[in-house]
Structures are given as structure tokens and as C-alpha cells.
Swiss-Prot record:
GO terms for cellular component: bacterial nucleoid; cytosol. Belongs to the YbaB/EbfC family. Keywords: Cytoplasm, DNA-binding. InterPro entries: YbaB-like_sf, YbaB/EbfC. Binds to DNA and alters its conformation. May be involved in regulation of gene expression, nucleoid organization and DNA protection. It is found in: Cytoplasm, Nucleoid. Residues 1-25 are annotated as: Disordered. SUPFAM superfamilies: YbaB-like. It comes from the Bacteria. NCBIfam families: DNA_YbaB_EbfC. GO terms for molecular function: DNA binding. This is Nucleoid-associated protein Pmen_2646.
Amino acid sequence: MMKGGMAGLMKQAQQMQEKMQKMQEELANAEVTGQSGAGLVSVVMTGRHDVKRITLDDSLMQEDKEVLEDLIAAAVNDAVRKVEQNSQEKMAGMTAGMQLPPGFKMPF
């Protein structure tokens, strides 16, 4: 009985590891869009935190450099927050059925 239980646990652990690997790949390839200035600046970022694209509204071309820098920084920060939120939501959904002890932190 103990031997079968251990084999079952090992199989579950392997399946979980495979699911985690697939989830991490999906998260890394996911794209989010952060915005600032009511959409005047947008930043597209991957789950790896790679910035793919920055879009500036034409009306901003008349603004001074400092305003543009602030808006770009705010849009990047918004994208980073969205990447983190997306990761947390996906991982929470994956671990929802697991019997984990209170306060247990997954190693990812």
C-alpha cells in the first residue's frame, strides 16, 4: 500500500511539473498592454518583461521631453504590474485544487 501510494505521489508530482512548465511557457509568451495618459502612451510587454512595442499618440509630439519620459515610465510600470497580476492569477488557478498547507509558497 505504501509503495503504491508513493508511486502515485511521484506520478502526480511529475504531472504537476509538466503542467507548471507548460504554464510558465504560456506566461512567458503572453503579451499585456500597459497605458498612461488615458491611453496616449501604451507599452506592449511579454511575460518575460520584454518590451515589444511603445506607442505614442501624435498629440504628445508637442510635449516637452520630461512629460514624455514620465508617461513612458508610467506605461512601463503599468505593464509590469499587469504581467505580475496575470502570472499570479494563472498560477492561483493551477494550484486551486491542491491541498497545500497554509502559507506554503510555490517555488516560482
